[in-house]
Amino acid sequence: MKFVDEANIRVEAGDGGSGCVSFRREKYVPDGGPDGGDGGDGGSVYLQANENLNTLIDYRFTRFHMAERGTNGRGRDCTGHGGSDLVLQVPVGTRAIDQETEESLGDLTVNGQKLLVAKGGFHGLGNTRFKSSTNRAPRQKTLGTPGEVRSIKLELLLLADVGLLGMPNAGKSTFIRSVSRATPKVADYPFTTLVPNLGVVNPRPGQSFVIADIPGLIEGAAEGAGLGIRFLKHLERCRMLLHIIDIEPIDGVDPVYSARAIVGELEKYSPKLAAKPRWLVFNKTDLLLDEEIQAKIDRIVKELDWQGDVYTMSAYNRTGTEELSIKMLDYIRSLPAIVEEITADADVEFKWDNYHSAEDENANENYDDDFDEDFDDDDYDVEVIYQR
């Protein structure tokens, strides 16, 4: 199945049903009073995380989604039926962004988690609601409020513990194949990897972590060179980064220059992402003699002024990959557990929150005197006796 990590959709919540103006009319009860029911609430639109999905491809072809409208109220105090909510299934790790305000509506990081993206309209009030001692036969009602309409951008961010960084042909896909059962395409030309890949690494029985491989970066990616930086978003949730450097590039480019270019593109995209823990890993050591390897590493580390962790491996021969996997596992397990921050709901005033109270006050202040003069409140409990 094609991997799609972005989609634009339009969601429309259902409108609220309108209230009803009706009066009780039965045999022997000519002035029964108001009995118009309220309308039903409009259906809302939700996003729900589903662990069985791994792509947003369905939303590339179906872009418009609408919840059900609430039905209108009826006589005899019949309330309208509320509209059914619309629940859209998305992969775990999906982020919803309002395209008009560029506001992040929320992230779905747990299976089954739901996110409200468009609230349904509130129901209208029937004329029974406006009954009072001075307005005993009201002919007022309110309309249901319209449901929210939003244009939303869906972004799928992969959930992984370790993210791989590096130039094209640095050996990232070969590394993920050597330490996991993932099978990304490997070839001797740049940009073999066109979409992100995930692999589960099991260095010890019962202990594992997830590693993410993204397409390679080149200088100028922030301006759109190569495949651009659109795939860097998949590293935002990684707990550490593995910067893989080709120690003996076939094109003769200095590894120092390549490493600085990667860091520069990372900082342009997100300083927060650039500040994540990062290890340097020199790959393709099988192409050099042992004495050449250390000399070259010392020179690169010195020119980069690197103070962090440094490792060597040959992903093709699987030399050093197992030891590196164990060290990554130990480091990840030493990090504090991720705790989901639960923030208090913001006190947001929706446009319909005070709508009905205002309409009620306005109706009672400016009511029409057009009502039945002989109306009797006791008619609600009247006992009807049928005689021949």
Curated annotation (Swiss-Prot):
One GO cellular component term noted in the UniProt record for this chain: cytoplasm
Cofactor(s) required, per the database record: Mg(2+)
Binding site for GTP: 166-173, 191-195, 213-216, 283-286, 314-316
Protein's cellular compartments: Cytoplasm
Gene Ontology biological-process annotations: ribosome biogenesis
Single annotated GO MF: GTPase activity
EC number(s) per entry: 3.6.5.-
Keyword Hydrolase: yes
InterPro entries: G_OBG, GTP-bd, GTP-bd_Obg/CgtA, GTP1-OBG_CS, GTP1_OBG_dom, GTP1_OBG_dom_sf, OBG_GTPase, P-loop_NTPase
Domain OBG-type G, chain residue ranges per copy: 160-333
Residues that hold Mg(2+) according to the record: 173, 193
Segments forming domain Obg: 1-159
Predominant location category: cytoplasm
One Pfam family recorded for the sequence: GTP1_OBG
Keywords on record: Cytoplasm, GTP-binding, Hydrolase, Magnesium, Metal-binding, Nucleotide-binding
UniProt family annotation: Belongs to the TRAFAC class OBG-HflX-like GTPase superfamily. OBG GTPase family.
HAMAP family registered for this protein in UniProt: GTPase_Obg
Subunit organization: Monomer.
Role noted for this protein: An essential GTPase which binds GTP, GDP and possibly (p)ppGpp with moderate affinity, with high nucleotide exchange rates and a fairly low GTP hydrolysis rate. Plays a role in control of the cell cycle, stress response, ribosome biogenesis and in those bacteria that undergo differentiation, in morphogenesis control.
Protein known as: GTPase Obg
Organism lineage: Bacteria, Pseudomonadati, Pseudomonadota, Gammaproteobacteria, Alteromonadales
Recorded name of the encoding gene: obg
